[in-house]
Amino acid sequence: RTILQRITLIAAQNQEDGERFLSLGLKRNQLAVTGSLKFDISVTPELAAKAIALRSQWASRRQVWIATSTHEGEETLLLEAHKELLKNHPTLLLILVPRHPERFPVACELTRKAGLTFTQRSTGEVPSSGTQVVIGDTMGELMLLYGIADLAFVGGSLVERGGHNPLEAAAHAIPVLMGPHTINFKDICAKLAQDDGLITVTDTASLVKEISTLLTDEDYRLYYGRHAVEVLHQNQGALQRLLHLLEPYLPVRGH
């Protein structure tokens, strides 16, 4: 409470967080709910052009799904799902992107053990028509790789890691799937799910079922992709609201 008495303003990302500060003794006139800065992302024309070019190189006549920010215990489930999906979608390509660099070689080994053919993004090798998996073992390319995919699974959510950011996938207007463990992005996932911008899966079987439907039903796929990006757009503006709140505290700029 002593610390809160010395604070002039708190900008909370949602009402729930704001209420927590009020319960600690913050005065209501010192609280502003700005929304989450994570919504303030977009796909630039340059990025979109790069993604289109890479898609034409990698999979001009193939469907592609991406699984990102995966953790120990998830890659095995995702590779099992991919093997199952290949039975009805034999040309399907999976881009598998582990969360941490130390899991890049592990993902390669798990893919090899699963009996799937793969390439590594870091080598620059272009996937052939027989390549079933691309291991996304580079840094800083996630937004580009999302741009290649028809749908995305965001990891840390089938295992109890709290989930990772679904908005980077949503920005590309593609369907977003996550497991049940999304506490790290509780508010964002709730907003997406409420407006049909997020599909929740619980295991390999439900993942296969949902992805199969998305791959075979274009209207269903476009519906979820459109709703995901609409939720993103509807919740943008946090950065501008924050800058507006900070303006009175910043020094006046000279002419």
Regions found by a protein language model. Name each.
Residues 1-255:
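Nucleotide-activated sugar donor-binding and catalytic core shared by glycosyltransferases
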